[in-house]
């Protein structure tokens, strides 16, 4: 990001942002597996709720901060410097406090430490016997996420849904300036303040998910501590219903400057809450359903939704000084759609798509366990079926003579 801030031309800026995007994708890709390692079934939901809230608050807060920075004497370069400074701070904190979470790696390091102390070189972890070759590396890191994405109905549909949600998140970064700055004549900096509606909505969604955690933990206790993935879908079902309502609300109130700006701003309460509940519980569901390959399932999800996020996003406001915004490659999806169709019908198209996606969490709540039983990757000893097996085992033990 520091290189982006000092770029002299657009080509240099794009190359630097390309590498920034590659390295910035790491936390999003591995967080599911890391949280599966760190947190137990009772606390993982709250941890992912906090993480997801930050994921969505960032894009909504940054236009406000960036808008005022770029409109001040600091200029657009300090928007890049600010991001770089925050990234450097995160690197510093990670280097001090973040430790390895993957059990195989931890045990390998422990075995190596014992060998160094005892000089008994026969001590080793079984994973050290594995020969790391290029083929297995490609299979695990590249092919496995793609297999999960295209061979697992749960991963595919949840990923497509969250990719759409993620795209809408970045689409709002284009739609809000059109509604509030272009249509209503509000200055670019002040025109970012309606994002506060989305910010409050995200916080409401996070609170909704956390409110369902006691219910999930009761189900978890009834299931002998074994995850019940489908119970994660209840807040997602609420979000799936609320989301199209928020989109239609924004579309048909934002299109008319005669309607007070607070009305489309308040639609952010619905869309923000829905975005958070859908995205968050989708991640929780994938982690619970695919515990042993959770990182690969999340990587597949991150891969596809990042494409949607890039495709729905136009050129950031502070980069339009390079005077290349007429390029269809850079306008991509959002700007062209809202200018050609109008806010009302562009938002309605997205609302109808949200209605089409609405049944997904309801279908998996009913049929998810059956699909997981047919899966080659999802553990079969989780969910309601595991509870039945556990109860049968307890009954058999009671019937055995003592």
Language model region names:
Residues 12-26, 34, 233-281:
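Hydrophobic core of transmembrane alpha-helices in multi-pass small-molecule transporters
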Residues 25-40, 277-290, 294, 300:
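Intracellular juxtamembrane helix-capping segments at the cytosolic ends
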Residues 43-73, 78-90, 201-208, 304-312, ...:
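Glycine-rich segments within core transmembrane alpha-helices of 12-TM secondary carriers
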Residues 77-78, 86, 91-140, 200, ...:
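Intracellular terminal tails of multi-pass secondary transporters
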Residues 4-12, 23, 39-41, 74, ...:
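Helix-breaking motifs and short loop linkers at transmembrane-helix boundaries and internal kinks
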Residues 140-206, 276-284, 313:
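Extracytoplasmic gate region of multi-pass secondary transporters
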Residues 65-74, 97, 180-181, 213, ...:
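Interfacial helix-cap and linker-helix signal at transmembrane-aqueous boundaries
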Residues 16-56:
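Cytoplasmic helix-loop-helix junction between adjacent transmembrane helices
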């Amino acid at each position: 990001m520091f290189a982006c801030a000092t770029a002299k031309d657009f080509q240099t800026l794009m190359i630097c942002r390309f590498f920034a995007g590659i390295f910035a994708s790491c936390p999003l890709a591995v967080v599911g597996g890391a949280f599966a390692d760190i947190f137990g079934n009772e606390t993982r939901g709250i941890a992912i709720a906090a993480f997801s809230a930050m994921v969505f608050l960032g894009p909504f807060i940054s236009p406000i901060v960036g808008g005022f920075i770029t409109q001040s004497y600091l200029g657009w370069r300090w928007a890049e410097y600010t991001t770089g400074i925050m990234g450097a701070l995160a690197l510093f904190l990670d280097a001090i406090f973040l430790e390895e979470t993957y059990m195989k790696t931890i045990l390998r390091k422990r075995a190596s430490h014992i060998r160094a102390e005892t000089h008994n070189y026969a001590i080793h972890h079984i994973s050290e016997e594995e020969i790391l070759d290029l083929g297995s590396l490609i299979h695990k890191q590249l092919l496995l996420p793609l297999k999960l994405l295209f061979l697992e109905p749960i991963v595919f549909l949840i990923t497509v849904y969250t990719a759409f949600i993620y795209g809408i998140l970045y689409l709002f970064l284009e739609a809000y300036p059109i509604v509030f700055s272009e249509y209503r004549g509000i200055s670019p900096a002040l025109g970012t303040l309606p994002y506060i509606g989305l910010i409050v909505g995200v916080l409401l969604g996070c609170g909704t998910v956390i409110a369902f955690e006691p219910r999930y933990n009761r189900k978890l206790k009834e299931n002998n501590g074994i995850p019940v993935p489908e119970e994660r879908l209840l807040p997602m079902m609420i979000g799936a219903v609320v989301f199209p309502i928020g989109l239609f609300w924004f579309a048909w109130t934002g299109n008319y400057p005669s309607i007070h700006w607070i009305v489309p701003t308040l639609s952010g309460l619905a869309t923000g809450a829905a975005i958070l509940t859908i995205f968050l519980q989708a991640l929780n569901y994938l982690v619970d359903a695919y515990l042993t390959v959770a990182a690969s399932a999340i990587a597949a999800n991150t891969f596809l939704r990042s494409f949607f996020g890039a495709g729905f996003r136009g050129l950031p406001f502070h980069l339009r000084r390079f005077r290349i915004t007429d390029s269809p490659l850079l306008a991509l999806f959002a700007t062209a759609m809202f200018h050609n169709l109008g806010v009302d019908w562009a938002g309605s198209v997205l609302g109808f798509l949200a209605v089409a996606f609405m049944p997904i969490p309801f279908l998996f709540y009913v049929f998810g366990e059956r699909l997981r039983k047919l899966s080659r990757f999802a553990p079969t000893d989780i969910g309601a079926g595991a509870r039945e097996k556990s109860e049968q085992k307890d009954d058999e033990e009671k019937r055995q003579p003592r």
